[in-house]
Design a protein with these regions (language model features):
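Transition-metal
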Residues: 1-137, 197-228, 253
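Ligand-binding loop in jelly-roll beta-barrel domains
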Residues: 78-80, 88-93, 102, 112, ...
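His/acidic/aromatic-lined binding-pocket segments of jelly-roll/cupin-type domains
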Residues: 85-86, 94, 116-119, 157-158, ...
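Surface-exposed loop/turn positions
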Residues: 92, 164, 262, 270, ...
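Short, structured patches in soluble enzyme cores that scaffold and shape functional sites
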Residues: 98-100, 121-124, 133-135, 146, ...
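Double-stranded beta-helix
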Residues: 130-153, 183-223, 316-326
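Short acidic-glycine-tyrosine-enriched beta hairpin
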Residues: 154-167, 181, 285-307
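Acidic/His-leaning functional-site neighborhoods
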Residues: 231-299, 307
Length: 326
């Protein structure tokens, strides 16, 4: 077992920009790069291993070959690979949308529902996003406002700043606004129900599909209760600062702001995913120098469970998002 640098598939949705290509090194033939799927075993876009014995094979193929123990004991409760991690560049507004919970999604769509979190990497001045409702409404009012295009009168629009954290529980109405760059950690699902899309058309020249009936069945009609900040306070450790961004039954996410070095322990409990969002760093272990990795801005790696201890060392300051399963 060894740390694996991953190559991310990219998506060219109509609302995307160019920052992921220009600033984060994502390779795509499209003019727009809306999303890069940094950690994915989903059928709609799979991470490919870039180094070592499994170079050129998908992460899913590696897991199938080596067995689910590489995911760790804490992943034993999941039937499928549990998470999907993305970088999202919203040059334009995303649709107003909602994701179903596990029970509904598994029954209707044949895959997990989607609870997710957003870590705001950057935001234009005045940027905002839609996060639930201002106040509780009835299901009848919800359906009527969708019908007469007045839904946005009762939605909760929140100013967005770099470093904000939004926990989007399944069933929460939401929309990322234009001018926002986000790291998204979510359940392994690509099920989205669009409710409102500003009258836009897709590449085929036709209005993009809406999913009103399903959205009405799964949307929570009460305001969100989570604060829009990290779940924990910054904790100073030797060489770096660690902040718990969010933790739930599906994922735990921390921000590492590294001055000199950070220690990463890949225990038997869970794999670890590291995503560099600023700067660069060397990932190394004293006992396997051949598996040393250089990770630059926008690059990520998968460390199998039980791989041991690693040192993450930047030439200068470096910011990393670390995800694992508890």
């Amino acid at each position: 077992m060894y740390p694996m640098k991953l190559t991310a598939p990219c998506k060219d949705y109509i609302w995307g920009g160019t920052r992921l290509r220009d600033e984060y090194g994502k390779k795509s033939d499209s003019d727009k790069v809306a999303e890069s799927w940094e950690l994915s075993c989903h059928k709609d876009g799979k991470s490919v291993i870039a180094n070592g014995e499994y170079a050129g094979r998908t992460l899913e193929e590696y897991i199938e070959k080596e067995g689910k123990q590489v995911l760790g004991k804490n992943c034993g409760r999941f039937e499928y690979f549990p998470v999907l991690i993305k970088l999202i560049d919203a040059k334009d507004n995303l649709s107003v949308q909602v994701h179903p919970d596990n029970d509904y999604a598994l029954r209707v769509e044949g895959e997990y529902g989607k609870t997710e979190m957003w870590y705001v990497i950057d935001a234009d001045e005045g940027a905002e996003l839609l996060y639930g409702f201002k106040h509780e409404i009835t299901r009848e009012e919800f359906a009527e406002r969708i019908k007469n295009n007045t839904l946005l009168e009762v939605t909760n629009n929140v100013p967005v700043h770099k470093g904000d954290v939004f926990f989007i529980e399944s069933g929460t109405l939401h929309a990322i606004g234009k001018g926002i760059l986000i790291a998204e950690i979510q359940q392994n699902s690509n099920t989205t129900y669009r409710i409102y899309d500003y009258g836009r058309v897709g590449k085929d020249g036709k209005p993009r599909e809406l999913h009103i009936e399903k959205a009405c069945e799964v949307t929570k009609l009460t305001p969100p209760t989570r604060p829009t900040k990290p779940q924990g306070e910054p904790v100073r450790k030797e060489g770096y600062t660690e902040t718990l961004l969010a933790s739930c039954g599906y994922f735990t996410v921390k921000a590492l702001d590294i001055d000199t070095r950070a220690w990463i322990e890949a225990s038997e409990g869970s794999f670890i995913h590291l995503l560099v969002i600023d700067g660069e760093a060397i990932l190394s272990s004293g006992h396997e120098p051949e598996h040393t990795l250089k990770l630059t801005k926008g690059e990520s790696c998968f460390i199998p469970a039980g791989c041991g201890n690693f040192e993450l060392t930047p030439p200068e300051r470096c910011s990393v998002v670390m995800t694992y399963i508890e």
